[in-house]
Each structure stands twice: as C-alpha cells, then as structure tokens.
Amino acid sequence: MEVEKKIRGLREELQQHNYNYYVLDKPQISDYEFDIKLKELQELEEKYPEFEDDNSPTRRVGGAVTKNFETVVHENRMYSLSNSYSKEELEEWEARLKKIVEGKIQYVCELKYDGASISLTYENGILKRAVTRGDGFQGDDVTNNIKTIRSVPLKLKDEFPHKFDIRGEIVLPYEGFAKMNAERVEMGEEPYANPRNTASGSLKLQDSAEVARRPLECLLYSITGENTGVASQFEGLEKARKWGFKVPAESELKDSIEEVLHYINYWDEHRHDLPYETDGVVVKVNNFHQQEELGHTAKSPRWAIAYKFKAEQESTKLNKITYQVGRTGAITPVANLDAVQLAGTVVRRASLHNADQIEKLDVREGDTVFVEKGGEIIPKIVGVDFTKRDPDSNPTQYATNCPECDSELIRKDGEAQHYCPNVNGCPPQIIGRIQHYISRKAMDIEGLGGETVALLVNADLIESYADLYKLQKEEVLPLERMAEKSAENLINGIERSKEIPFERVLFALGIRYVGETVAKKLAKHFKSIEALMAASEEELVNIDEIGERIAWSVVEFFNIEANRENVERLKEYGIQLEISAEKLANQTNILEGNTFVISGVFEKVSRNDLKKMIEDNGGKLSSSISSKTNYLVAGDNMGPSKLAKAEKLGTSIISEEDFLKMLE
C-alpha cells in the first residue's frame, strides 16, 4: 500500500505542476525537477503494473486547453518528447532504435528553443489556421495573432504541397525582450519575468494589435501531413526554407551518436551566443520510413528525443529579504544571498517579484534556495531546499509599511505589486522621479547625475523637479565632490533645459504608462499642458493608440494637487509646456497615413531631422520594411537588405530630394 500511496502522490503532484505550467503559465519547479519526478513515476508504474491508470501524467502530453479561443482538434497529434540528460541515455536510446530498424541511421540535430509551440496549416500556399499545442490532441485557434508575426509567411513561395501542417516555436529574442522590459520599467510597470512566458502569453492576448507590437518570431522545424513530397526530416527543413519559413540555420545532419554528442557539447558551451533562449537539443531519426517503423509510445515518438541542458541553477543561503521602492512607489522584494557563481557572474541578490511569489514558493529567511538565471534581467529564486530548512523557521510576513517612509502599503485590486502611497514624502520616489526628469531622453540636464540628485534631496535642497529651477550655485557648492566649475555646469545645465520641447517635458513629468511615444502623441494632439490637464478619460481614449489604462493614469496624475502645483511652478520658471508657435506653423498633415523607413547617409538634412520632419507632418516612422511601409527614404550607403526587401514588396524608394519635395 505504501507504493500505491507514493504513485498516487506523484501523479497528483505532477498533475498540479502540469496545470501550473500549461494552464496558468506559472511553473513552480524547473523542467529538470519535473522530468526527474516524471521519470520516478514511470519507473514505479513499470515495476508495479497493477497500479496502471490511463489518466496518469505519464500517458498525457500536457495540461488543459485555455478556453479564451476556439478549441480546435489537431489533425496530426502534437506529441511531446522524451527527455535525456546524459551521454548514456542517448546511447541507450540509439540501442533501442537499432533493435527495431535495420540499416544506417542518420540523425538531425536541432536546437530546442524555449518558447510556445504552434502548428500552422497551409492550403494551396495560404496560411489557413494557427493552433497552439494545448494538450497535444487539441489547442486554441490563434490565427489572427499569429498573422501579426512577420516571420510567419502568409503566402508561400516556390512549389509546395497542396495541404500540410508545419510545427514550430514562437520565441521572443533576448534583444526584443530587453527592449520591452526597458519600456515597461520606463512607464513604471513591472518587467516581464522571462522570454518564454512572455511569448506564450502573447499568443493568448485578445488584441492582435498588441501582439503585433511585440517582437515575436516563429522558428519552424517539422513538416507533417500526407503527400508532402518530403522523404526525410532534413529535406523537410531545406524545403521549408525555400517556401519562405524561418528555419534555424543551426540544424545539422549527423551520421552517428558520437557526432550528435559533439553537436550537443558545442551548443551547451555556445548557447549564450544565440539571440534566443534555448534549453537543449532535439535529436530526430532523419528518414521518414524509419520514423514510421519506430512509431510512437502513448506519449512521445520513439524516433526523437530531447537532450536537456542542465539549468544554470545553484543553491545558496538566503540571508535576508529586503524591499526596494521604485519611482512610482512599487515595492519589490529582494533576496539577499550568500555570493554564488552563476552563468559567469557572481550573484548576491535575486528578485522575489511580489508577495504572491514569496507565498507560492514559501521562501523564508535562512532557507537554502535554488537560484536560476535564464533570460531574466536579474536572477530569480525558483525553489527552496526544504530538507535544509530550520524547523524553527517562520513563514515570511510581507512588509506592511514602506521601508523608507513607514507609510502603510496599499495593493489595488487585480495588481500583483504593493505600493507606497506617500508620493510626495517618500525619498526613493522623490529621487526616482527627479532622476527620470533629468534623464537623457527627458530634460537631459548636463552636469546633473543620479548621485547628485540624491545628494540634493538628502540635503533638503530639493523635494521635486520644480525645485531644481530655484537652486543657486552657492547652495550646491558645499555638496560632496562639487567644485566651482561643476557647480556652474549644473546651474547652466538646468537653465538650458528650459529650451527642451513640450513633448519631452511631458515625458519627463513621469506620468505612469506615458513613455516617449505616448508623450509625443499627447503633445501633438493637445498642443499645451492646459488642454491636456482639462481632458477627460473619454476624450483621451478617443486618441489613436491611447487605451483606458493610459487615460486613467493621465487624469489621475493631474488630479493630484502636488502635481498641478509642480506644473504651475514649471510654467513660472519658463519651461516649454506648449508646442511653440514656430513649431505649430511647421506642422502639417501632408504625410498622414504614410509610413516611412529611413536608411543611409544624407547630404542636406540629418537622419534625426528627417525623422522630425516626418512626424511633424503627420507621417509614421518604422525601423524595418514591411508590407505596411509606404516609402523607403534612401541615402548613401544604405543597408542592402532593406533595399532588397523594399524592391521585393514593391515599396516606393525615394531620395532625400524626393522626400523634401513631398513637403512643398
């Protein structure tokens, strides 16, 4: 009975982890830990077949299907893969293959990208449907969202089968992920946890326009269907490339397991050179006839196996949980650790994200914790070694008061973060807002850095960004590391900031969710701070690309008396709080409805001036050519890839002079 109890317990635990991973997109353990538990259950079920259960996690591919989209049954089931973690396990797999098939076996090695699996159906060269993996038997129809991903061809090239499915992975490159998080932090939002969950969550967004704004990519790796004219896995990859799919160039054909192991070892060392997150290598029998002979188990194909890289994870002691306050008042718990080497860096601190995460992991001070570093900005704690826990330890009580000003924290319905409401009295919020105000993309005050701002606040010389404009040289001279010349530079830099245009001043105010792009849009629409302050949520929502959240935040900001007072003071000090008459005279809607891409070096005007001209005259700017691009403004030494793509898509290619004539 003890064995039956153990089996039942493992099944329940794995089913819960499946639910967390596939339904909630909130895994509580690493893939490696999950696979170890699954393997333990498989071995027990094989040893004690009397406890067999058709609903065991060992017989299923994954979790339940999300119900937000239409559920679609896969014509060809999407199996999961068996996992391996050692050379010996790969050699055992090969031995099993050779017992079933005769003749030489070739292998295709493919990097295992960590994203969201997708199945695309094409008929007569046209994308008809895109379905998530779901539970392997059925998934969610996310066609509209997938169509926004530019690496997914809507119409194929060359000669292709009448109908087929092609499987792939939706991934978020590190660079794009970092950019998304930088924008979120800039707007006072919590950064996304990692590329995989962000990619997966993107597919389930209701608004396809939001998906289009995310730099997702689709990497394809497997053709399936009848009468495809493809005889092997590697041939399928080559044909898919010809048809217009993005197929990773790192995939290689190998003649032996020894060559496969060389491939695995190479990429285990070089995976951080790739633009995407990878967690292993998939090894497949190349020949489709041999694949057919080998067949499938109830859970996975016998002809393929995944070799999982060991997670870059270490255990260390959590000494103390402290709390940081951001410029918007958001509270972030931080784990202070014994120093540990991880992914080439020394880690002493790790994110705990929020109160829910602490409760979910049951993290306590004094615990030995597992720290992991993947695509995250900073390392994170993924688990606790409960075998090493002090029996007298107490559960973590999340902070109830601000660590800086002792104000009672608040937590709004539906939000993960706690906030300090003491907007105008909490030092980190004051310092953070002023540091944002002086930053390069905002007021760009020369001679004034983040450390100096902290010194000024701590010396009670300033309490808001408006206070900067009343500073005198004599007041700042006594500050640490402040000499006569640097004090002069600081005061002069503050004075010059009075020339910064309205849209940058609006961004500098630090309104939550109002980044550079939104600030430009609001400035252009309202033309003055008075008009913006008088706007209602309804009026704001009617502006293109301004949603309810931004509208609420803008109105809320100007409802606060201290913010209105700061704006009045800025006006008195001569800050640009409206679009200048000269700029208004230069603005038109001549280019409205047109999207431009700029490439190369120009003679008469700089690239920045060109961009400004486009925006001032109602046009839109893009960094890359797409079917929505109307004009490519071509200068000397322009990128050949942009030129080729523009020619291919039939985009109008114009010179600097052609563009300037459009404004006449």
From Swiss-Prot:
The first-level EC class reads ligase
Binding of NAD(+), residues? D31, Y32, E33, F34, D35, S80, L81, E110, R133, E169, K284, K308
* Entry-linked InterPro entries: BRCT_dom (IPR001357), BRCT_dom_sf (IPR036420), DisA/LigA_HHH (IPR041663), DNA_ligase (IPR001679), DNAligase_adenylation (IPR013839), DNAligase_N (IPR013840), Hlx-hairpin-Hlx_DNA-bd_motif (IPR003583), NA-bd_OB-fold (IPR012340)
The residues annotated as the active site are K112 (n6-amp-lysine intermediate)
Keywords, A to Z, come to: DNA damage, DNA repair, DNA replication, Ligase, Magnesium, Manganese, Metal-binding, NAD, Repeat, Zinc
Query: What are the residue boundaries of the BRCT domain, all occurrences included?
Result: 237-257, 586-664
**Cofactor(s) annotated in UniProt:** Mg(2+); Mn(2+)
Q: Which Gene3D superfamilies match?
A: 5' to 3' exonuclease, C-terminal subdomain, 6.20.10.30, BRCT domain, DNA ligase/mRNA capping enzyme, Helix hairpin bin, Nucleic acid-binding proteins
Gene Ontology terms for molecular function? DNA binding; DNA ligase (NAD+) activity; metal ion binding
Where Zn(2+) binds, per the record, is at C402, C405, C420, C426
EC number(s) from the headed UniProt entry = 6.5.1.2
Reply yes or no: does the keyword Amino-acid biosynthesis apply: no
UniProt GO BP = DNA repair; DNA replication
Record-linked Pfam families: BRCT (PF00533), DNA_ligase_aden (PF01653), DNA_ligase_OB (PF03120), DNA_ligase_ZBD (PF03119), HHH_2 (PF12826), Nlig-Ia (PF22745)
What this protein catalyses is: NAD(+) + (deoxyribonucleotide)n-3'-hydroxyl + 5'-phospho-(deoxyribonucleotide)m = (deoxyribonucleotide)n+m + AMP + beta-nicotinamide D-nucleotide
Q: What is stated as this protein's family in its record?
A: Belongs to the NAD-dependent DNA ligase family. LigA subfamily.
Which HAMAP family does this chain map to? DNA_ligase_A
Q: Which NCBIfam families match?
A: dnlj, PRK07956.1
Protein name as catalogued: DNA ligase
Q: Which gene encodes it?
A: ligA
